[in-house]
Swiss-Prot record:
GO biological process: determination of adult lifespan; methylation; negative regulation of transcription by RNA polymerase II; positive regulation of transcription by RNA polymerase II; regulation of DNA-templated transcription; regulation of transcription by RNA polymerase II
Location(s), subcellular: Nucleus
Name of the protein: PR domain zinc finger protein 2
Residues in C2H2-type zinc fingers: 360-382, 390-412, 483-506, 1134-1156, 1162-1185, 1191-1214, 1333-1355, 1455-1478
EC class name: transferase
Organism: Homo sapiens (Human)
Family assignment from sequence similarity: Belongs to the class V-like SAM-binding methyltransferase superfamily.
Compositionally biased spans, kind Acidic residues: 265-297, 1251-1265
EC number: 2.1.1.355
Substitution effect: C106Y: Reduced histone methyltransferase activity
Region (Disordered), start-end ranges: 155-335, 405-457, 513-550, 622-660, 729-797, 903-1083, 1244-1265, 1478-1576, 1589-1612, 1625-1652
InterPro entries: PRDM2 (IPR009170), PRDM2_PR-SET (IPR044414), SET_dom (IPR001214), SET_dom_sf (IPR046341), Zinc_finger (IPR050331), Znf_C2H2_sf (IPR036236), Znf_C2H2_type (IPR013087)
Compositional bias (Basic and acidic residues): 204-216, 304-327, 1635-1645
Length: 1718
């Protein structure tokens, strides 16, 4: 465009005269001010740094013939194959866009832009970096400038490669086009504008005269030749030469057209294929037109081929900008330019179109045709316009028929609808071979595609209006304008074809026809207005127009290389929602999102978002200006520092476009907030398939938690972290922006991604494995770093994994959050801390989960990418420490990723090991830069800050993080985590420095998460600042703790937290109860972990904070102690909060505490912190652990912090005694609360006798606390839900609902089906204490009781898995686990009470089965579990009768380990101990156990082996389950089975027999044969045989028709709830184990009976176990049937299973009735 042409504008231009659409279209980097070069003109000035290579455009204007151009200053001449040289004239500001104001450079020194033609659209590309305050000056250097020449050449080469394939088709299509002129007419109109783009060669040739005058360079002369040359090449050389011309120059039309042309190439082929049947003629026409257009575009494409990337990059902005100007300019441009295009430039057209001899010019428009036929065909357009009287309501285009008009209007509508989807197109284009040139077009069109319809329509309207002079049809009568499909970027010659294609191919499934049409009409209307307003403006596509209308359309200068943006999009980094465009580190607008197809992912709100984005983007992106990655990283850090301000700022921004400021962080946070607030604007938070997968994975991991989490994710992610994940997690971008550390969705998603490296792959291809590198990369590539997901995943995938689970829980608890409460078992506070993370049902839990997160980080990370994380070593260490726990955690608590990490990280530092361990181990891998941070960060606030910055930086920008935080703030829990994050920094300062390091290492992930956001935004910045503000590291922790610890609400009020922390805290505090702040603190404490597993990290951090700042929370004064505790928690090492001495176990610590007994007489039994003042301890216990009144068992004087635990205890241990309890008011201390045991006893005697366990305080803690915790867990896990509120914390404790641990505590609901722990937990397990709770058994630290419960379940369930049946993926009993999956759902929940007491091992089997089936636990874990379980079972076998007795009445006295004589209150504890932790236990029992498992379920070893083969695994699992259920009698029976291998061959057959049993017992033998053949595994056969044996006995014992009927009915119901059934079976089996053992033995001796008899017997046992026995038996039968089904051929099995069930149910019920009676 010859802007500086000698012809000055008639009058001096003023800003007041600048059309609104121009201002709207201004990119945020530039502003209009009077030019310094030409005083009479307005100039474009950079307000922000503009990187070299950035493109602006396309240049918008009217297409005119050279003769029509009055002022060369504002025009570019472009060669169109059909029309020859046409001028894109923007002399009329209303017809142009802001590029018209870019003045001509007077010298090469001044020049910073050069024109680039892409698809006949002129773009301005930055020739060199432009600093703020510089005026953008463009000049066409032609090929003189090597850089420009190279850029143009690249464009050309790209265009050529693109053209090659489509051209061949074009020739074919042209012939067809001639045949279909009617369609072509529309195409012509549409193409009329498009060709303009094509001709938009920056040739000054047409302008030459004036330009030459104005710019005495030879460019004018040179340009025509070049253009001609280019024309021959299909890409005007000049434009090609200007390839570097940046976005400022290109016109939207040109750009869109370029996209259209390229798209046409692709689209034509596809379109033809897709729509050939329906639209063959039209398509042919269109294709011909498109082909011509493509050919035309091809030339530019050559030039633009290179640009496409840039386009992708810039397209969003460009498109956004274009739309407005384009819409205005397109119509006029179309009409005017069309004539120009018509100007027959007898230049050989690369396409070979005959331009040279346009013998037949159109009298209505300037199009000329080489053939009369072409002209006639073309005339249809005008005729329809004249006759018709059906005008498009959007663009006014006239049609001869209502049908045609409606078809045309649908395009507009589709354009409106597709706007969001269009974002995907660019990426698709990029992916396509056309990626370069076409991509450029696509990118431009991505927004324009949506706009495209309008734009095209506008063009059509323009054509119709200007029909007389503007229906540009190719010689053949083909319309040159290309109409790219928004969805697939296919290019069509006509809007009609494009719309038809869209409707048929893309929209059909999306919208009912009626709706589509209606919706389309409605949507396009606004564009129609625009179109009308800018009818004459030449715009390549209406869609950009629409978008432009919707919002500021400023060319999006996505980072210089589009590929990065695409990568974001492809990697899922770009959030695909309104915020996504902003989210992009690159300043992507909705248009850009469209470009990347993000809009589709996000929502069709792109337009609005665009405006918001613009506004938001400007502030946020200002921080992260054009630097797509690096800048963002820095910005993130900056934001982090300024997080408090950024938070508010971003908050507002986040509302409009939370993701804009800090893509990664903002997205996650905003999504998280979305749940609460942040994403309010993002009504449609898109949950990417990855996120969904993540959520699903989480669901698998935490069935209970996922529902809430998913809701949170979907909602918050739409709603929460998961919500944030929706947008952010959906893609890298999405995740970055949407998932704050606190946001469960994001975090879980991240975590999930982290877990399955592949899930991350999309977002973080090497997310897990390369987390460290990514973190490191974060610094390198801010965008990626910024991508919250990347960071989260990268930084703390394990934590994130845990966070995912935890976050899910948190999401559901934090966001659904006020009721989810997990049993708070004060018993093992410290351990819980470590374990809590895995649980991290809520952010509060997260706080407790601090340690757990570490462990989980290591565990999960180890699982996910053992290769790259020391975390794995941690995991190993954790496993070593508590193989059972670790395994259980993995199996039951994938969410507990950080549980063991703390232990592993002891090396990092006493504090570091606990939370930092995972962080450091994991950060090192995850956090390139952050990896080092963990220890250092923790050690020093600066380090923490760096970590946090790293976290935030990875999250995109701390600024965005704050926004995320802010959104998170709206969702109280997420904010809390951020606050916690703030708290974390101080803890890092404290001995827990490693924890902050984890924050930093995990922080990137946390950033995505609310925590991360908080950390990055407020907490982290605060971390640095706050740490400073804090009097001392401990004080900071204390303040944080005070803020977080004092209670979630305190969080908000915590002054200690930095302003950002407090502001965040306040927001979060106000929105969420006190527990969330704890989680916030936790998140602060372990930002890194939070980043990785936002909530879990939060939990982790909370835990750290709680450990470290537990007292501070309760009593800031003990912040130092807290810190010690925190260190303790963070490290597997237990730290004395008085002297900070680390200890490997709670026992050691407990022994050590006696040293401080004098000075510190009081001790927290949960977190083992010492207190000088009883009131402090009481406050601490109450605030952190939720311990209010103490309940003492009247029988054994055991004290319980929670009545539900006491009741469970009494049920378990004193079933035959009339139990009452004493209740001591809150503040009453238990014997465990005294540092000096003797003193404790004495003082406690006042209230009541001290627990016998008190002699060994450590043991007591372990047993008593564990017992209580176990009791709680049992209550939760057992179907026996206490009728009371059974809030673990107390009846009157109402804490923010913490999601239940990953595994679910099950209680029976009225249906008799185990209710998920979530349900139970939600109501009964409030967990507000974010105290550093340690597992008394393994010393693992947990931040909250829910985490502790999770850990205990993991720790204790390792051996008592049967008892708790907390599975890796807790499947709600309601969600019956399908036997074929081998997942014995936590069926034992219903039977948990009994099994728990006497046969927790059985649950282990079921858990193992579920784990195996889920394949989540590795074979090793399963094997270990099985071995442990087997060991426990062996023990049980030894004491089978004892167990039976215990079931009936658990021995009040402790159970003694046969190996080491250690006493245990619960048989479950003993079993766990014997199975996993007994140091003296011989190896043989495990072997026996294995054999037993083989015999019983054959799943322990068989399942493990079968794990490789799902079918076999399922079968074996089913067998195992069957064995467990039918043969869950003590090991003795299992042994009997193994001893009776003859029956082993019958297992499969037994299954079938079982199925057929209803038919006849005799069938059994038959089925056994086939079954045996199928399930050759002797174990199965043995199982079945045993089961059958049982059944006969059961049958002999009794047959109750009622039970059978009940069973059959239940079976049907349970068939639906196979999982629940399996669980029930497992539990029943466990309960029945002892009885069955005897019965089974008898049955065995009696001889194997039909499967039905065995099943019946098993059912009888279960029924005897409880009234639900019949239902359970049904479940059991059902499970068995399911197993059989899985074993048997899938088709027959189900049917047989049902029949079998029906028959078997009655029989079994009959048998069971007697059994139960027995």
């Amino acid at each position: 465009m010859n802007q500086n042409t000698t012809e000055p504008v008639a009058a001096t231009e003023t800003l007041a005269e600048v059309p609104e659409h121009v201002l709207r279209g201004l990119p945020e980097e530039v502003r209009l001010f009077p030019s310094a070069v030409d005083k009479t003109r307005i100039g474009v000035w950079a307000t922000k740094p503009i990187l070299k290579g950035k493109k602006f455009g396309p240049f918008v204007g009217d297409k005119k013939k050279r003769s029509q151009v009055k002022n060369n200053v504002y025009m570019w001449e472009v060669y169109y194959p059909n029309l020859g040289w046409m001028c894109i004239d923007a002399t009329d500001p209303e017809k142009g866009n802001w590029l018209r104001y870019v003045n001509w450079a007077c010298s090469g020194e001044e020049q910073n832009l050069f024109p680039l033609e892409i698809n006949r659209a002129i773009y301005y590309k930055t020739l060199k970096p432009i600093a703020p305050g510089e005026e953008l000056l463009v000049w066409y250097n032609g090929e003189d400038n090597p850089e420009i020449a190279a850029a143009i050449e690249e464009e050309r080469a790209s265009a050529r490669s693109k053209r090659s394939s489509p051209k061949s088709r074009k020739g074919k299509k042209k012939s067809q086009e001639n045949k279909n002129k009617g369609n072509k007419i529309q195409d012509i109109q549409l193409k009329t504008s498009e060709p303009d783009f094509t001709s938009a060669n920056m040739r000054d040739s047409a302008e030459g005269p004036k330009e030459d005058e104005e710019k005495p360079s030879a460019s004018a002369l040179e340009q025509p030749a070049t253009l001609q040359e280019v024309a021959s090449q299909e890409v005007p050389p000049e434009l090609a030469t200007p390839a570097p011309a940046w976005e400022p120059q290109p016109e939207p039309d040109e750009r869109l057209e370029a996209a259209a042309c390229e798209v046409n190439d692709l689209g034509e082929e596809e379109e033809e294929e897709e729509e050939e049947d329906e639209e063959e003629e039209e398509d042919d026409d269109d294709d011909e037109l498109e082909d011509e257009g493509e050919e035309e575009a091809s030339m530019p494409n050559e030039n633009s081929v290179k640009e496409p990337e840039i386009r992708c990059d810039e397209k969003p902005e460009d498109l956004l900008e274009e739309p407005k100007t384009t819409s205005e300019e397109t119509l006029e441009d179309c009409s005017e330019v069309t004539p120009a295009m018509q100007i027959p430039r007898t230049k050989e057209e690369a396409n070979g179109d005959v331009f040279e001899t346009f013998m037949f010019p159109c009298q209505h428009c300037e199009r000329k045709f080489t053939t009369k036929q072409g002209l006639e065909r073309h005339m249809h357009i005008h005729i329809s316009t004249v006759n018709h009287a059906f005008k498009c309501k959007y663009c006014g285009k006239a049609f001869g028929t209502q049908i045609n008009r409606r078809r045309h209007e649908r395009r507009h509508e589709a354009g409106l609808k597709r706007k969001p989807s269009q974002t995907l197109q660019p990426s698709e284009d990029l992916a396509d071979g056309k990626a370069s040139g076409e991509n450029v077009a696509s990118k431009d069109d991505s927004s324009p595609p949506s706009l495209g319809p309008d734009c095209l329509i506008m063009n059509s309207e323009k054509a119709s209006q200007d029909t007389i002079n503007s229906s540009v049809v190719e010689e053949n009568g083909e319309v040159k304008e290309l109409h790219p499909c928004k969805y697939c970027k296919k290019v069509f010659g006509t809007h009609t074809n494009m719309r038809r294609h869209q409707r048929r191919v893309h929209e059909r499934h999306l919208i009912p026809k009626g709706v589509r049409r209606k919706g389309g009409l409605e949507e396009p209307q606004p564009p129609a207005e625009q179109a009308q307003a800018t009818q004459n403006v030449y715009v390549p596509s209406t869609e950009p127009e629409e978008e432009g209308e919707a919002d500021d359309v400023y060319i999006m200068d996505i980072s210089s290389n589009i590929s990065e943006n695409l990568n974001y999009y492809i990697d899922g980094k770009i959030q695909t929602n309104n915020n996504t465009s902003n989210c992009d580190v690159i300043e992507m607008e909705s248009a850009s999102a469209d470009l990347y197809g993000i809009n589709c992912l996000l929502t069709p709100v792109t337009v609005e978002i665009t405006q918001n984005i613009k506004t938001t983007q400007v502030p946020v992106t200002e921080d992260l200006p054009k630097e797509p990655l690096g800048s963002t990283n820095s910005e993130a850090k900056k934001r982090r520092t300024a997080s408090p301000p950024a938070l508010p700022k971003i908050k507002a921004e986040t509302d409009s476009d939370p993701m804009v400021p800090s893509c990664s962080l903002s997205l996650p946070l905003s999504i998280s907030t979305t749940e609460a607030v942040s994403f309010h604007k993002e009504k449609s938070v898109y949950l990417s398939s990855k996120l969904k997968q993540l959520l699903q994975t989480q669901d698998k991991l935490t069935p209970a938690g996922i529902s809430a989490t998913e809701i949170a994710k979907l909602g918050p992610v739409c709603v929460s972290a998961p919500a944030s994940m929706l947008p952010v997690t959906s893609s890298r971008f999405k995740r970055r922006t949407s998932s704050p550390p606190s946001s469960p969705q994001h975090s879980p998603a991240l975590r999930d991604f982290g877990k399955p490296s592949d899930g991350k792959a999309a977002w973080t291809d090497a997310g897990l494995t390369s987390k460290k590198s990514k973190l490191e990369s974060h610094s390198d590539s801010p965008a990626w770093s910024l991508s919250g997901r990347d960071e989260r995943e990268t930084v703390s995938p394990p934590c994130f994994d845990e966070y995912k689970m935890s976050k899910e829980w948190t999401a559901s608890s934090a966001f659904s959050s006020v009721c989810n409460q997990q049993p708070l078992d004060l018993s093992s506070g410290v351990k819980q801390k470590a374990e809590g993370t895995g649980k991290t049902p809520v952010q509060w839990e997260s706080v407790l989960d601090l340690s757990v997160h570490k462990k989980h980080c290591s565990d999960s990370e180890g699982k996910e990418f053992k290769e790259s994380h020391s975390v794995q070593p941690t995991c190993s260490a954790v496993k070593k420490r508590k193989p059972t726990t670790c395994m259980l955690q993995k199996v039951l608590l994938n969410e507990y990723n950080g549980i063991d990490l703390p232990v592993e990280n002891p090396a990092d530092g006493t504090r570091s090991p606990s939370p930092c361990k995972s962080l450091e181990a994991q950060p090192d891998p995850d956090l390139g830069p952050g990896s080092g941070f963990p220890a250092p960060t923790v050690e020093s606030t600066p380090d923490v800050c760096p970590s946090s910055p790293a976290l935030q930086t990875p999250s995109l920008s701390s600024g965005q993080l704050p926004p995320l935080l802010i959104p998170t703030d709206p969702s109280s829990p997420p904010p809390c985590p951020p606050v916690l994050t703030v708290a974390t920094p101080p803890p890092p300062l404290l001995p827990t420095v490693p924890l902050p390091a984890p924050s930093s290492s995990a922080s990137p992930h946390p950033c995505p998460s609310p925590l991360s956001n908080a950390t990055a935004q407020s907490p982290l910045p605060i971390l640095s600042p706050t740490v400073s503000p804090s009097p001392s590291p401990i004080p900071p922790v204390e303040p944080l703790m005070s803020a977080a610890s004092p209670g979630p609400p305190t969080l908000s009020s915590s002054s200690s937290s930095s302003s950002s922390s407090s502001s965040f805290s306040s927001s979060s505090s106000s929105s969420s109860p006190s527990p969330p702040p704890l989680s916030a603190i936790s998140s602060v404490v372990s930002s890194g972990d939070n980043l990785e597993a936002s909530l879990p990290m939060i939990s982790f951090k909370q835990e750290e904070l709680e450990n470290e700042g537990l007292k501070p929370r309760e009593e800031p004064q003990s912040a130092a102690e807290q810190d010690v505790v925190v260190q303790e928690t963070f490290n597997k090492n237990f730290v004395c909060n008085v002297c900070e001495s680390p200890f490997l176990s709670i026992k050691d610590l407990t022994k050590h505490l006696s040293i401080h007994a004098e000075e510190w007489p009081f001790k927290c039994e949960f977190c083992v912190q010492l207190f000088k003042d009883k009131t402090d301890l009481s406050e601490h216990r109450f605030l952190l652990h939720g311990v209010g009144n103490i309940f003492v068992c009247s029988v054994c004087k055991k004290e319980f912090a929670f009545l539900c635990n006491l009741q469970q205890h009494q049920r378990d241990l004193h079933p035959d005694k009339v139990c009452t309890h004493h209740e001591f008011e809150s503040g009453t201390l238990r014997p465990q609360n005294f540092t000096d045991p003797s003193k404790a006893h004495v003082e406690h005697m006042q209230s009541l006798p001290e627990d016998p366990l008190e002699t060994s305080k450590e043991e007591e803690e372990l047993n008593d606390s564990s017992e209580e915790l176990y009791t709680t867990i049992k209550i939760m896990a057992s179907g026996i839900k206490t009728k009371d509120p059974d809030v673990r914390l107390g009846l009157n404790q109402h804490y923010p609902s913490f999601k239940p641990p990953p595994f679910q505590y099950h209680h029976r609901n009225p249906m008799g089906i185990g209710v998920t722990a979530t349900n139970f937990t939600t109501h009964n397990i409030p967990q507000t204490f974010t105290t550093a709770i340690r597992c008394t058994k393994c010393g693992k630290g947990v931040d909250n009781m829910p985490e502790l419960h999770k850990h205990i379940l993991a720790c204790a369930s390792a051996s008592d898995k049967k008892r708790y049946t907390p599975k890796k993926n807790p499947v709600p009993l309601k969600q019956t686990v399908q036997p074929k999956n081998g997942v014995v759902v936590l069926d034992n929940s219903g039977k948990n009470a009994f099994r728990r007491m006497g046969q927790p091992k059985r649950l282990n089997f079921s858990v193992e089965l579920s784990k195996m089936s889920s394949n989540k636990l590795k074979l090793n874990a399963l094997k270990k579990k099985n071995q442990l379980v087997q060991k426990a079972i062996l023990q049980k076998n030894k004491s089978a009768k004892q167990k039976a007795d215990l079931k009936n009445a658990c021995e009040s006295s402790s159970h003694i380990c046969p190996y080491c004589n250690r006493e245990f209150t619960y048989i479950g504890s003993l079993n766990k101990h014997a199975a996993f932790s007994c140091p003296k236990k011989p190896l043989s029992p495990p072997k026996k156990k294995v054999s037993h498992s083989s015999k019983k379920g054959g799943h322990s070893s068989p399942a493990s082996s079968d794990k490789n083969s799902n079918s076999n695994h399922r079968r074996r699992t089913a067998d195992a389950e069957i064995k467990m259920q039918s043969m869950q009698t003590p090991l003795g029976k299992t042994r009997a089975r193994s001893s009776g291998p003859t029956q082993v061959p019958l297992p499969s057959s037994s299954f079938r027999s079982k199925q057929n049993v209803k038919f006849a017992a005799s069938v059994k033998s038959k089925k056994p044969s086939s079954s045996s053949l199928r399930n050759s595994s002797p174990i199965r056969m043995a199982k079945i045989t045993h089961v059958e044996g049982k059944k006969p006995k059961a049958v002999a014992k009794n047959h109750s028709a009622q039970l059978s009927s009940k069973t059959s009915r239940s079976l049907h119901v349970r068939v639906q709830k196979s999982k629940a059934v399996l669980q029930s079976k497992s539990t029943l089996a466990s309960k029945k184990r002892t009885d069955r053992f005897n019965i089974k033995s008898r049955e065995r001796s009696g001889g194997p009976v039909t499967r039905s008899l065995q099943l019946a017997a098993a059912a009888d046992l279960s029924e005897n176990k409880r009234e639900d026995g019949s239902a359970k038996q049904e479940l059991k039968d059902f499970s068995y049937s399911l197993r059989l089904a899985s074993r048997c051929s899938p088709p027959a099995a189900p049917y047989i299973t049902r029949q079998y069930r029906k028959v078997k149910a009655p029989a079994a019920a009959q048998f069971q009735g007697p059994f139960f009676k027995e």
